[in-house]
Curated annotation (Swiss-Prot):
The glycine cleavage system catalyzes the degradation of glycine. The P protein binds the alpha-amino group of glycine through its pyridoxal phosphate cofactor; CO(2) is released and the remaining methylamine moiety is then transferred to the lipoamide cofactor of the H protein. The modification N6-(pyridoxal phosphate)lysine is found at residue 262. NCBIfam families: PRK04366.1 (NF003346). Keywords: Oxidoreductase, Pyridoxal phosphate. It comes from Thermotoga maritima (strain ATCC 43589 / DSM 3109 / JCM 10099 / NBRC 100826 / MSB8). This is Probable glycine dehydrogenase (decarboxylating) subunit 2. Belongs to the GcvP family. C-terminal subunit subfamily. GO terms for molecular function: glycine binding; glycine dehydrogenase (decarboxylating) activity; pyridoxal phosphate binding.
Length: 474
């Protein structure tokens, strides 16, 4: 039932006292012709409605959330407390810089810390999410070559295992996207060599990649990319695996985008809020979006980079997310962040070892923070697909992994347990998944009709995507 269906004419959740200020009528041209169709409910009905909706949701505060390539780690509540401090909560972006020195200092110091973590020379905090950061990075690439008069570079090379946003971001900026083939789950260096020429503007990579494998030829790839005059772009989706161990800048990357809402522990999902800072090496610093923050003596000021691509978002980005990420980094410290990556990799390898007993691991061996399993054999022998397995997992009160990604693995399950889950939780999750796979052979219909115990049963996802309903009534 929607909040509109609970509406009863005349019910109110809040009443204002009578006002002694004389009434003033607005001109007719500003008035609605009909009253807005807003729900009329009492406060108890309002609270109960949204409380019941919340109880139907799942979050990392309820249990493991192993979506691959999403880094759904537990988010310390201290971060929320910091972001809710009055000095951060009650400011306005139009205030004079003299009155928001604390906020500017936080942004300046956060940039410095992120540059140290990634090996970049400067950074913008404006982008609102990872894909937005990618778009910003591609705009910088385009402007860089335009400024050099090198207008013939129209191609961006992207691995076949890449996130879908990689080719989308490059395409939106006007580049032609060319796919690099994989070999043993990593970039095929020989295929890359054939594709690199004077028309290539950039190569976009994730390292570790979406299969959870570290690109062992990354230094060679960087050298080849730079020799042909192109830039190397780093998708920071999987940075959680390498903090304190290796830096993108030291691998040879020129541009990097991060996902503060993932790696640096701020709640995310359902479209936000996110933050996708973009870091660059020295030769690209002048192309960063404005405004940028700098320190002038004891004051923090805003400035416009000389060759800026312009604004990519209003004001200064999703500022509360910046506060949470800043708090997380200070709380963890350098050793703590390194420990985060160590535990993320350990947990992934432990869980992979449990799961490889009953599911295929196409690219086996040591993984980083995540791994990809395949239910192709299960589907071939039982007719049960990965989607059915994922739906059945819901009946056990936990969230399924990412499914059908990356596209180069048939019937894929992409699993990222993160560093914040303990051994008992990992054991329980493996036990649930094994039980579901066993059930596929013994009672396949139970999976094909799952979930059975959730408030909402299986929906027609194709219909939902093709004919979405955006209104509460037709």
């Amino acid at each position: 039932m929607t909040i509109f269906e609970r509406s009863k004419k005349g019910r109110k959740a809040f009443r204002l006292p009578e006002s002694d200020i004389p009434e003033y009528s607005l001109p007719d041209r500003f008035l609605r012709r009909t009253p807005p169709e807003l729900p009329e409910v009492s406060e108890p009905d309002l609270v109960r409605h949204y409380t019941n909706l919340a109880r139907k949701n799942y979050s990392v505060d309820l249990g493991i959330y192993p979506l691959g390539s999403c880094t759904m780690k537990y988010n310390p509540k201290l971060n929320e407390k910091a972001a809710n401090l009055e000095g951060f909560r009650e400011i306005h972006p139009y205030q004079p810089v003299e009155t928001v020195q604390g906020s500017l200092r936080l942004m300046y110091e956060l940039k410095k810390m992120l540059c140290e973590i990634t090996g970049m020379d400067d950074m913008t905090l404006q982008p609102a999410a990872g894909a937005h950061g990618e778009l910003t990075g591609m705009l910088i690439v385009r402007e860089y070559f335009k400024n050099r008069g090198d207008t013939g570079r129209k191609k961006v090379l992207v691995p076949d295992s890449a996130h879908g946003t990689n080719p989308a971001s490059a395409s939106m900026v006007g580049f032609e996207v060319v796919e690099i083939k994989s070999k043993n789950g990593m970039v095929d260096v020989e295929d890359l060599k054939k594709l690199l020429d004077e028309e290539v503007a950039a190569v976009m990579l994730t390292n570790p990649n979406t299969l959870g494998l570290f690109e062992k030829d990354i230094l060679k790839i960087a050298e080849m990319t730079h020799e042909c005059g192109a830039l190397l772009y780093y998708d920071g989706a999987n940075l959680n695996a390498i903090m304190g161990k290796v830096r993108p800048g030291d691998m040879g990357f020129d541009i990097v985008h991060l996902n503060l809402h993932k790696t640096f522990s701020t709640p995310h999902g359902m479209g936000g809020p996110g933050s996708g800072p973009v870091g660059v090496k020295k030769h690209l610093v002048d192309f960063l979006p404005f405004p940028q923050v700098k320190k002038n003596g004891e004051l923090y000021e805003l400035f416009v980079p000389e060759k800026t691509i312009g604004r990519v978002r209003s004001f200064f980005g999703n500022f509360p997310v910046l506060v949470k990420a800043y708090t997380y980094i200070l709380t963890m410290g350098r050793d703590g962040l390194e420990r985060v990556s160590e535990m993320a990799v350990l947990n992934a390898n432990y869980l992979k070892k449990k799961i490889e007993k009953f599911l295929e691991i196409p690219y086996n061996g040591f993984c980083m923070h995540e791994f990809v399993a395949s239910a192709e054999k299960v589907f071939r022998e039982t007719g049960v697909r990965t989607l059915d397995i994922a739906k059945r997992i819901l009946d056990f009160g936990v969230h399924p992994p990412t499914v059908y990604f990356p596209l180069i693995v048939p019937e894929a399950l992409m699993i990222e347990p993160t560093e914040t889950e303990n051994k008992e939780t990992l054991d329980k999750y493996a036990e649930i998944l094994e039980r579901v796979v066993k059930e596929a052979y013994e009672n396949p219909d139970a999976l094909k009709n799952a979930p059975h115990n959730t408030p909402v049963r299986r929906v027609n996802e194709v219909l939902a995507s093709k004919k979405p309903v955006f209104r509460w009534r037709g």
